[in-house]
Amino acid sequence: KHFKILSSSAAYWRGDEKNQTLQRLYGTSFQNSKDLKKYLLMLEEQKKRDHRKIGKELDLFFFDDEVGPGLPLWTPSGTVLIDELEALAKEKETAGGYLRVRTPHLTKGDLFSKSGHLDHYMSSMFSPMDVDGIDYYMKPMNCPYHHKIFANTPKSYRDLPYRISEYGTCYRYEKSGELFGLMRVRSMQMNDGHIYC
């Protein structure tokens, strides 16, 4: 009975850019005006805590058109914050028995073909680049690399569980309409860990 239109946006029919654009309305409704007002007040409070607003106010990160959408640039203040969070996480991971690893940003397509990424995840990957006649891809996730590291040397049951972790930069092709601050980006630092038993 009590409703409010909250926002509107454009969307492609069935999510396909080749189809016509439709107008999407977002709204909410409640049984009484008191609950509606309470909900709208909560939304206003959330806006004050929006990471995009805080990031700008505290000069932590920004996006630049020449760099490209979904590719955040971290300022010195933001980098200090990231470094502190990473140090805390690394401390916890070390205490949990994780070993740190590093993996490359580019990989031959063969690895992603074997891992199933090309069959099941290619629409979220950037197009390949040709290097000496071989397709290379920017990594969308760290898993296949970690599996390679685990398989690189023979393991005894005494070596298990084998724990590795990494702050790997991953790249995902997010469509422009899917990008949202730091929540949906095209380049991200992913804290990733794997346990082999």
Model-derived segments and spans:
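Auxiliary tRNA-acceptor-end handling modules of aminoacyl-tRNA synthetases
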Residues: 1-164, 168-169, 174-179, 183
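Hydrophobic, small-residue-rich alpha-helical packing segments that form membrane-like cores
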Residues: 196-197
